[in-house]
Amino acid sequence: MGISKDEYLKEEKILSKVQKLLGDTLNELGKDVYQDEEDFTEFKKMMWENSSSFDAGEMRQVMAATEQEAEKVLQKQRYFKKLCQIKTKPYFASIVFKDDHGKIWNIYISLTYLKDDDFNNILYDWRSPICSLFYDYEVGPCSYVAPGGEYFGELKRKRQYKIENCKLVGVFDNSLNIDDEVLQEVLAHESSDKMKNVVNTIQQEQNQVIRNLEDHNLIVQGIAGSGKTTVALHRIAFLLYRL
């Protein structure tokens, strides 16, 4: 269902704050990436110029150090590219989760994570454990599994957004997960419970396949265009995130 005008204005303010933080982070990270590339080039040059004085054991250590430095640079570059990807559409959904200790968590779900200067999570990567609540549950009692164990609580709200060119153009609350933009626009006004339940079942089953950690081999059957390839690609992304 649609949300009130006050709620809509509140969401616009949140989007504005996220956009500013995202812009600031990109500026700082861009400088870091550029400097890292220069430093790494100098590091390789130094290693190469001194390589003749290394024995076999020292050379292995040099190679390992070089690979380690290269991986640090690549990780930062990959994160920078991800932030560039979400610059105009920083997030697509949010949940309000009340844990069994009474603490309220406002989780904004994105393609990657974003932290503020105090290292607080502002955006959560969709692959993180707590974000599975958005895909697996309707509003009500819920739980998710994280490295520290299983956490219980109540899903108070599920909200989805349509953001275009940094502007909020659509928001609706729904107990379900709707992945289709046309359906989002319809549901922002009204639709039958039957339609909502059908879409929810599909999305929930897809998420179960994507996040399955118990079975090493999975067989997914479906007609052409049913989303098998999409599920496979998202499963690969999820498994890589878990490494």
Functional labels for PLM-detected ranges:
Residues 1-199, 203-211:
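Extended, charged low-complexity regulatory segments
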